């Protein structure tokens, strides 16, 4: 939201950046667009649907771990390892989603009057920025999938280790 500071004649945006009154547009639609963007986040975040599906998958996996614990087909120490690893992965995904997709989008020419318009075909800065952000998004998804797979492998190792130690204790 934008509010106008009556003492200095500037408009203060929700992020705290002040826009001088001379550079402010005459209509009030700009402030409503800025507040709408900052409250809803970016309209088409490239990988937000994939992250949501991945987080749902982890939540289902957590439910299956709880069912295994209830049926006691697996040792309690192994269940604790599984649940803690899955909670840690879910927490890391939530943090990553906040940092990558954020609650407020990057400023654009329409939302920030101090940004130049690089939309001409002769300038490749906008294309470069799009390519870099897409590459970083893809890399982020790949890294978190690898983190999840590594946690699954580690859980299997811990389960195997707990099974062998319990077998040794019994005999």
From Swiss-Prot:
It is a single-pass type I membrane protein. Keywords: Disulfide bond, Host Golgi apparatus, Host membrane, Membrane, Transmembrane, Transmembrane helix, Viral envelope protein, Virion. The lineage of its organism: Viruses, Duplodnaviria, Heunggongvirae, Peploviricota, Herviviricetes. Pfam families: Herpes_UL73 (PF03554). It comes from the Viruses. Residues 154-171 are intravirion. Residues 1-132 are virion surface. InterPro entries: Herpes_glycoprotein_N_domain, HSV_GN. Belongs to the herpesviridae glycoprotein N family. HAMAP family: HSV_GN (MF_04037). The gene is gN. This is Envelope glycoprotein N. It comes from Elephantid herpesvirus 1 (isolate Asian elephant/Berlin/Kiba/1998).
